[in-house]
């Protein structure tokens, strides 16, 4: 049976998802081919960010100095509690195996993943709790390589509080805007990641 419309809405920028999907597919394809160079070009275009893709130890230390001591103390308190709970929770999980019927064996085996990519919403608003909850719990779970990724706020880069929160456990902190799909998923892969807000 054919659809009959009483009234058909006109397509607008908000409702015409088809063209948006085509644009996003093109961006992702460009990033996949051009990697860091293209992602930085796209970040400059959309995010107005022209800084480094990977934050250096000096940039991380600089960010720390921009945060009031009271906020740092509160973040340490939260981090410690998140870590304590995550470790206690991990302690309640165990490998198990059982035979449901003769010859039908089932069970679970806990195997930590080798790498985790933690997206932290950022841009104009700092989501400090997202940084702590994702990065800290990954560390407690035994993940060896943790990458934290957050969008910049223009040329200011990542909010200093997000950098500080993620730096407690992440191996790399990153700051570029166009494509989270570029985030490395294993150690020693190309070291670049990005996200869009």
Regions found by a protein language model. Give the residues of each.
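Short acidic-hydrophobic, aromatic-tinged amphipathic segments that line or gate anion-handling sites
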Residues: 3-7, 173-178
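Low-acidity, Ser/Thr- and Arg-rich intrinsically disordered low-complexity segments
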Residues: 169-175, 182-196
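Short acidic/polar active-site loop segments enriched in Thr and Asp
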Residues: 35, 114, 144, 172, ...
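Generic short N-terminal amphipathic or hydrophobic helices
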Residues: 26, 41, 59, 145, ...
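Conserved small-residue-rich beta-alpha loop and adjacent elements
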Residues: 99-164
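N-terminal Rossmann-like NAD(P)+-binding subdomain of aldehyde/semialdehyde dehydrogenases
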Residues: 1-114
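Short basic, glycine-rich beta-strand/loop surfaces that mediate nucleic-acid
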Residues: 162-168, 179
